[in-house]
Amino acid sequence: MLLSPHFWQVDFALDRLTVGLQKTTGMTNENRQKLVAYHEAGHAIMAALTPDYDTVAKVTIIPRSNGAGGFTLFTPSEDRLDSGMYSMRYLKGQLVVALGGRVAEEIVFGKEEVTTGASGDLQQVRNIARRMVAQWGYSKDKLGATSWESPDGNGGFGPAAASAVVEARIDEEVTQLCADAYAACKTMLLDNRILLDELTEMLVEKETVDYQEMQGLIGKYYPDGVNEKMVMPAEAALM
C-alpha cells in the first residue's frame, strides 16, 4: 500500500487519517508477516533507488483497521506539491515503485504464490499509464503529443472523440508501458536482492522502519548515494 502525505511530521493522527487505526493485536501469522514485509520492502527499495523520487518517510507491517496489512509512507518534494506538475521521469518512477510489492512477492515466493494484495497497486499503475498516453501526450510514437481524454466533470477523465483505431493504439501503448515498468522493477529488485532481504528482516523484527533507519540502510550499500547511472538498466526498459 502506498501513501504520500504532505508533511514531514508522521504521527499517530496522520496515520489514523490516512490508513486507519493501528490494530493492537499486531500480526501473528509468521508467513503472512513475512509476505507483507517483502511486499512493503519492495515498494520502499524501488522508491529509495529511483533518483529524484519521493522520500520514504516510513515503512510498516502493522495492520490497520481499514484492512491494510502494512504501508509505505512517502514525503513528496515541496516543488512538486506547490506546482502540481509531474515530469515523465517521475511518472515512470511511480509505475516501478507501485509495482515493487507485487514484483518482490514474485521474486521471493514465485509466480504461483503471488497474492491479490497488490490489486490496488496494479489499478494505480494502469491508471497512471493510461493518463500518460491518453491525457498527457507521453505516447512513444504512434499517437504523438496529443490528449485523447477530457475532464468528465467529476474530477476524473473520460474519452474524447477518439476512433476505435486510436483507442486500440492507446490500449496497446498502455499495456506495453505497464509491461516495461514490471520488467524494469524486476531487474532492479533482482540486482538488489540482498538489500530487499535486509529491509524485510528489519520489518519482521521491528515492524516499523523510519526515515533515519531507511537512510542508514541505503547508505550501507550505496555510500556515495543513488545516481542516474546506477539505475540506467531500469530506466532503459522504460525509454
Predicted features and spans:
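Conserved AAA+ ATPase small/helical "lid" subdomain
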Residues: M1-V10
